[in-house]
Amino acid sequence: KAVIRENIANLFPAWNEEFNTFKGSSSEMLRYAMGSWWERIGNTPASGIPKLVMGEAQNFPEIANFYHAEVIEPGIALIRRILQRGIDGGEFRKIDLDQAVHTVYAPMIFLMMWKNSMGLCTAGTQINPERFIDMQVDVLLHGMTL
Protein backbone atom coordinates (compact mmCIF):
# COMPACT_ATOMS: atom_id res chain seq x y z
CA LYS A 1 0.00 0.00 0.00
CA ALA A 2 2.85 2.36 0.81
CA VAL A 3 4.40 1.78 -2.63
CA ILE A 4 1.09 2.65 -4.32
CA ARG A 5 0.66 5.78 -2.21
CA GLU A 6 4.26 6.97 -2.57
CA ASN A 7 4.57 6.40 -6.30
CA ILE A 8 1.11 7.06 -7.72
CA ALA A 9 -1.67 8.11 -5.34
CA ASN A 10 0.30 11.02 -3.89
CA LEU A 11 0.33 12.71 -7.32
CA PHE A 12 -3.42 13.41 -7.39
CA PRO A 13 -3.45 16.43 -5.05
CA ALA A 14 -0.91 18.20 -7.28
CA TRP A 15 -2.79 17.20 -10.44
CA ASN A 16 -6.04 18.51 -8.99
CA GLU A 17 -4.33 21.79 -8.11
CA GLU A 18 -2.98 22.02 -11.65
CA PHE A 19 -6.53 21.49 -12.92
CA ASN A 20 -7.77 24.33 -10.72
CA THR A 21 -5.17 26.77 -12.04
CA PHE A 22 -4.86 25.60 -15.68
CA LYS A 23 -5.28 28.55 -18.06
CA GLY A 24 -5.38 26.76 -21.41
CA SER A 25 -8.23 25.11 -23.29
CA SER A 26 -9.72 21.80 -22.22
CA SER A 27 -8.11 20.18 -25.27
CA GLU A 28 -4.74 21.47 -24.10
CA MET A 29 -5.53 20.28 -20.59
CA LEU A 30 -6.36 16.78 -21.82
CA ARG A 31 -3.13 16.63 -23.82
CA TYR A 32 -1.18 17.94 -20.83
CA ALA A 33 -2.82 15.47 -18.41
CA MET A 34 -2.05 12.45 -20.57
CA GLY A 35 1.52 13.59 -21.18
CA SER A 36 2.02 14.38 -17.51
CA TRP A 37 0.70 10.97 -16.53
CA TRP A 38 3.24 9.33 -18.83
CA GLU A 39 6.09 11.49 -17.55
CA ARG A 40 5.29 11.01 -13.85
CA ILE A 41 4.09 7.39 -13.83
CA GLY A 42 4.21 5.60 -17.18
CA ASN A 43 7.84 6.40 -17.92
CA THR A 44 9.04 5.43 -14.43
CA PRO A 45 9.50 2.16 -12.57
CA ALA A 46 6.11 2.88 -10.95
CA SER A 47 4.52 1.86 -14.26
CA GLY A 48 4.93 -1.76 -13.21
CA ILE A 49 2.64 -1.33 -10.21
CA PRO A 50 -0.66 -1.36 -12.14
CA LYS A 51 0.42 -4.46 -14.07
CA LEU A 52 1.24 -6.23 -10.83
CA VAL A 53 -2.00 -5.16 -9.14
CA MET A 54 -4.15 -6.19 -12.11
CA GLY A 55 -2.32 -9.47 -12.55
CA GLU A 56 -2.67 -10.40 -8.89
CA ALA A 57 -6.10 -8.89 -8.13
CA GLN A 58 -7.71 -12.30 -7.72
CA ASN A 59 -5.04 -13.41 -5.24
CA PHE A 60 -4.84 -10.11 -3.36
CA PRO A 61 -8.27 -8.45 -3.57
CA GLU A 62 -7.51 -6.14 -0.64
CA ILE A 63 -4.61 -4.57 -2.57
CA ALA A 64 -6.74 -4.36 -5.73
CA ASN A 65 -9.51 -2.60 -3.79
CA PHE A 66 -6.97 -0.26 -2.23
CA TYR A 67 -5.52 0.54 -5.67
CA HIS A 68 -9.00 1.17 -7.02
CA ALA A 69 -9.82 3.57 -4.18
CA GLU A 70 -6.46 5.37 -4.16
CA VAL A 71 -5.66 5.49 -7.90
CA ILE A 72 -8.51 4.48 -10.20
CA GLU A 73 -11.27 6.49 -8.53
CA PRO A 74 -9.24 9.72 -8.24
CA GLY A 75 -8.02 9.24 -11.81
CA ILE A 76 -11.53 8.81 -13.14
CA ALA A 77 -12.69 11.85 -11.16
CA LEU A 78 -9.91 13.99 -12.63
CA ILE A 79 -10.59 12.84 -16.20
CA ARG A 80 -14.29 13.50 -15.67
CA ARG A 81 -13.49 17.04 -14.49
CA ILE A 82 -11.40 17.69 -17.60
CA LEU A 83 -14.11 16.40 -19.92
CA GLN A 84 -16.88 18.22 -18.04
CA ARG A 85 -14.86 21.45 -18.25
CA GLY A 86 -14.71 21.01 -22.02
CA ILE A 87 -18.45 20.34 -22.26
CA ASP A 88 -19.34 23.25 -20.00
CA GLY A 89 -17.10 25.57 -22.01
CA GLY A 90 -18.64 24.49 -25.32
CA GLU A 91 -15.37 22.98 -26.50
CA PHE A 92 -16.51 19.32 -26.33
CA ARG A 93 -19.89 17.99 -27.37
CA LYS A 94 -22.13 16.44 -24.73
CA ILE A 95 -21.04 12.84 -24.23
CA ASP A 96 -21.66 9.98 -21.82
CA LEU A 97 -19.02 10.84 -19.25
CA ASP A 98 -19.38 7.48 -17.50
CA GLN A 99 -18.05 5.79 -20.64
CA ALA A 100 -15.87 8.61 -21.94
CA VAL A 101 -13.52 8.48 -18.97
CA HIS A 102 -12.66 4.89 -19.94
CA THR A 103 -11.81 5.95 -23.51
CA VAL A 104 -9.22 8.31 -22.04
CA TYR A 105 -7.51 6.07 -19.53
CA ALA A 106 -7.80 2.65 -21.24
CA PRO A 107 -5.17 3.46 -23.91
CA MET A 108 -2.85 4.70 -21.17
CA ILE A 109 -3.27 1.41 -19.29
CA PHE A 110 -2.52 -0.43 -22.54
CA LEU A 111 0.61 1.65 -23.09
CA MET A 112 1.88 0.93 -19.60
CA MET A 113 1.08 -2.78 -19.87
CA TRP A 114 2.81 -2.97 -23.27
CA LYS A 115 5.89 -1.22 -21.91
CA ASN A 116 6.18 -3.70 -19.05
CA SER A 117 5.43 -6.86 -21.03
CA MET A 118 5.46 -7.25 -24.80
CA GLY A 119 7.39 -4.03 -25.32
CA LEU A 120 10.38 -5.68 -23.69
CA CYS A 121 10.65 -8.38 -26.34
CA THR A 122 9.14 -7.10 -29.59
CA ALA A 123 11.76 -4.88 -31.17
CA GLY A 124 9.89 -4.77 -34.49
CA THR A 125 6.71 -3.36 -32.96
CA GLN A 126 7.99 -0.80 -30.50
CA ILE A 127 5.57 1.94 -29.54
CA ASN A 128 6.84 5.48 -29.12
CA PRO A 129 4.91 6.60 -26.02
CA GLU A 130 4.92 10.31 -26.82
CA ARG A 131 3.72 9.75 -30.39
CA PHE A 132 1.13 7.25 -29.17
CA ILE A 133 -0.24 9.77 -26.66
CA ASP A 134 -0.29 12.56 -29.26
CA MET A 135 -2.19 10.30 -31.66
CA GLN A 136 -4.58 9.16 -28.95
CA VAL A 137 -5.41 12.75 -27.98
CA ASP A 138 -5.84 13.68 -31.64
CA VAL A 139 -8.26 10.78 -32.22
CA LEU A 140 -10.15 11.60 -29.01
CA LEU A 141 -10.53 15.24 -29.99
CA HIS A 142 -11.05 14.94 -33.74
CA GLY A 143 -12.03 11.35 -34.51
CA MET A 144 -10.88 9.71 -37.71
CA THR A 145 -13.54 10.88 -40.14
CA LEU A 146 -13.02 13.70 -42.61
Short names for language-model regions:
Residues A14-F19, K51-G55, H68, M118-A123:
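Short linear capping/connector segments at secondary-structure termini
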